[in-house]
Structures are given as structure tokens and as C-alpha cells.
């Protein structure tokens, strides 16, 4: 379940424990619907409510991990249904860290990755309610490939007006670029 009222002292999600029948590491919320989508890609979000909102607004290709971080099993499951994944995690620091952890798993599964960073809202659900599906579609079209996204994350760590920080940024960016192809 998910808390509806905003309570900073309560967990946002309360999830069932894993059992022999229900294995969160191997299932994705909404996949039963998303695998039928004609859009040609899947959208991976953090929360059930994000996936539900996306479906309500016409993005019938949205899935969410079931109250757990993305796993290798999830990535493999995604690769059975698509070659392209839009990774759209919450805008907060935890969501962006989770996106960074998800990228290599999705790559190992052979998926092409686009990363969309939500602006002016905390998550896809809130964004859709505030701005609607047309603005969300524009965000999808403007989403970054994983290298652009990671370079932007690195850039955000440094004030490149300072020489020492500019040097640190260039070194870290070069390290990322050296891992490519």
C-alpha cells in the first residue's frame, strides 16, 4: 500500500514481504498491461502511483518495481519486452541515486536507456497532474541518453567557475567517457 496523506513520519510505501508465490525481485507492477503497448518502449518508474498515473494519461507502457530497488532480474524481464527503456525516477536525491544504480543493470541487460529527470514536480504522478500529458511527452522527447545524464550529474557536483572544481569535473567526466565503447 501507499500512504495518501503527506506524513513525514510515515513510510511512503508499505509492501508485502516476499513469499514463495510473490517475489518482488522478479516482478514489475503494470507489466501485464505495458507489454501490450504499441509505443515501442517501456517507461520504468519508482512508484506504483507513478505507473498508474502514466497509464491514466495514455502512457500505457509504464512499469514500476514492486517496492524494491531495480534488480538484475527486473532488467532481464524488461529486455524480454523492449529494447528501449525510459528511466524516470523521482526528482529527489534518493530517486536520482537509484537511477544511477539502475543504469548499469539496464545496460547489462542489453537495453538502450534514456533518462528523464523530472523538473518542477517530485515525481511523474505529480508532474502529470500539474502539467498534463502533452508536457510530459515533451520531457520524453528531450530526455538524455545515459552518458548525457551521467555527465549532467557529475556537472551538478562542481562549481566550474572555480578552477580546482573545474579540474575535478573534467577528471571525473573523462573517467566516465573512458568507459565508453
What do the predicted segments below correspond to?
Residues 1-81, 85, 98-99:
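Phosphate-handling DNA/RNA-contact segment within nucleic-acid enzymes
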Residues 35, 79, 103, 125, ...:
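Generic hydrophobic alpha-helical scaffold/packing signal
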Residues 38, 89, 93, 180-181:
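Residues at alpha-helix boundaries and short interhelical turns
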Residues 68-120, 127-133:
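Conserved catalytic cores of soluble enzyme domains
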Residues 112-181:
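C-terminal or mid-to-C-terminal helical accessory/interaction module adjacent to the motor/catalytic core
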